[in-house]
Regions:
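Short, Lys/Arg-enriched N-terminal segments with co-localized hydrophobic residues
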Residues: 1-9
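Enrichment for repetitive, rod-forming helical segments
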Residues: 2-3, 22, 143-144
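Bacterial N-terminal signal peptides
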Residues: 19-29
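Intrinsic low-complexity/disordered segments
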Residues: 2, 32-34
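A structural boundary/capping signal
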Residues: 11-14, 34-220
């Protein structure tokens, strides 16, 4: 996950006060792992979506990615904002998240590229948190999932550091694909603080208002 100057750019003044809050949230996680992952019909139980609350500054490295690879940032408003969650899609999402977490070696951008922050597809098999998320989005889009329903998202993690994940918006809530865990959880059961995500209406980012979430115990 992003650290130092990199984290500061991604979070834009949202991080310094969150340590004690996260400690409380992580200790309080009360939902069961079974409830978080799958309902009786082979799909996750429905949960409340993550609501956006105005514009937010895009991470610098995302802007750089857009210059190098415009297609990674393009928004097609003709695509669905949310996808229908089916047993097949759920299995695909869970399997793909776990597979990419195994396939890609986690390395910092400084070790990988010699720079503080760079977003890119991990074509050489190495990457930071945002690179995992970009590849997951690409692979899911190749299966037919609406690109517009999959959003790069910046959070504050359990270590009070900036972190990037992929949010998949569905008719049963918003789910998080994360290189830190193989379980795919509803956004509000990850234990993270949600800072901002890509806009679904234009090339840009929207604020998530620092929404605080609880965590599900014993889910990896």
């Amino acid at each position: 996950p992003p650290q130092g100057q990199k984290g500061d750019d991604m979070l834009s003044n949202h991080r310094s006060f969150m340590g004690p809050v996260l400690a409380i949230l992580l200790a309080a996680g009360g939902a069961s792992a079974a409830q978080a992952q799958q309902g009786s019909a082979g799909i996750p139980v429905a949960s409340a979506p993550a609501d956006a609350s105005g514009d937010a500054r895009a991470p610098y490295a995302w802007t750089d990615l857009c210059k190098r690879s415009p297609a990674e940032c393009r928004v097609n408003i003709g695509e669905a904002e949310r996808v229908e969650m089916t047993p097949k899609l759920w299995k695909t999402i869970v399997a793909l998240n776990s597979r990419i977490n195994r396939e890609i070696e986690a390395v910092t951008d400084e070790d990988h590229w010699g720079v503080v922050d760079r977003w890119d597809l991990p074509e050489d098999g190495k990457g930071d948190c945002e690179d995992f998320a970009l590849l997951k989005r690409k692979r899911l889009a190749e299966t037919g999932v609406s690109r517009r329903a999959m959003l790069m998202t910046v959070v504050i993690d359990e270590e009070n550091a900036g972190h990037a994940v992929l949010m998949v918006r569905t008719d049963r809530g918003d789910f998080i694909l994360d290189n830190k865990r193989n379980a795919v959880l509803p956004w509000n059961q990850t234990g993270y603080v949600y800072v901002k995500r890509e806009s679904q209406m234009r090339t840009g980012w929207t604020s998530l208002g620092g929404a605080q979430t609880s965590t599900v115990a014993s889910v990896r």
